[in-house]
Amino acid sequence: MLQASGETRVVTPHDVSMERRTKTVPIIYIVGPIAALAGLLFGMDIGIISGALPLIAKAFRASDVIQEFVVSAMMLGAALGAVTGGWLSHRFGRRITLLISGVVFVLGAIGCALAISAYMLIGMRAILGIAVGISSYIAPIYLSEISPERSRGALISGYQLSIMVGILLAYLIDAGLSYSGSWRLMLGSMAPLAGILVVAMFFLPTSPRWLMSKRRDDEALGVLLKLRQNDAGVAQAELAAIRQSLQVEGNGFRLFRKNGNFRRSTFLGMLLQFMQQFTGANVILYYAPKILGLAGIATGADRMWGTVAIGVLMALATFIAVSQVDRIGRKPLLYIGYAVMGACMLGMGVLFTVGLGTAFSAGIAIALLIAFVISYAMSAAPVVWILCSEIQPLNGRDFGVSCSTVTNWVSNFIVGATFLSLLTTLGTGTTFCMYAALNFLFIVLVYLLLPETKGVTLENIERKLMSGVRLRNIGI
């Protein structure tokens, strides 16, 4: 039986035996990268504003406060998207929710490109943020639910990498269009990729886990057969595992009220996201051309290509981190990352305070900036998202991850909405020293509060968590 969308079907034993003899390319290697387009758009939305902002400020004669809201409106929308994404996903499924986010991406990007005032642009950026918030919450869940166990980590890590690639792509677009001065083309450049995501989602499979949660087991089996190269044994085993896990799942908010350790793990996830944002990394991502100008790079084109170099280094560093996090561990990467980021922020703060009077001192400031973004991409950027999922029990994971995701976007908004004002009121040097102090504080918090989950199964983490073991000890 085929559904109208053509995405699922009921499979007879004869179908299974015939299809198992057919050699096929694993469909997961097609589905995964298409779903990761959501991460690419997420990254583009973060990165594209850095090159467009100086041109927008000139076109609309925008004050520092207006510029801050042009940047940070996206985060407010993303917080709303993260909240509503869970309801949409439960009601309509992961695939349809990603399709909806793609439509909102298209509308938001076109609206930004056609904005006739700074206030209209702020509104359109908020609409784009809703799409970012929905996709940032749903895409990793969708990927985890369609992936085979052996490649689940790689596909989810690939999603995180696609965010960094999206940032790099945005920086390249900004640099290429900087000569024309067309900020409208910069902001509208996301629309074609978002359109591809919308069209592609019509052809991708529905999450088998969601289908089973709606008591559509036959359709779930059909999807699993497609995803597992028609291996009926693997598909049936996975179907049974999903059925068992669904019996365990409960109401996350009810568990939050009743279980003190789950409340603590939820607050720890929220703290981790706060720490990630208040490293000051997104200050670099959003205002990179301005910071490079403060460091002594004079021309706009040079600043744009300097920003591209930052994007390249971040993408490479993230690739290294996601390939090594299971070998090195979570806490060592965070210790090193926060220490290096704190030292870099402190060094830049001192240099900006005493003044960059020579080419040598300007070069040191740029080197510190580069070291900072590499450290961030190899530590807090990927590790925090991994930990936020690992430290939550299965029957409260949706609730816990949703809370931490909203915290990420609210913290992101605060950072983006205050940076230019801080430069004006406190001065450049003091602002960077403030972020340095926060990074050094985060080292202490990692030591006191975080578990090391390297090599520990999710089942063991959950068993310790739900039995009341102190959070710091639920890992190794």
Residue positions per predicted region:
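Alpha-helical transmembrane bundle of multi-pass membrane proteins
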Residues: 2-218, 223-225, 244-476
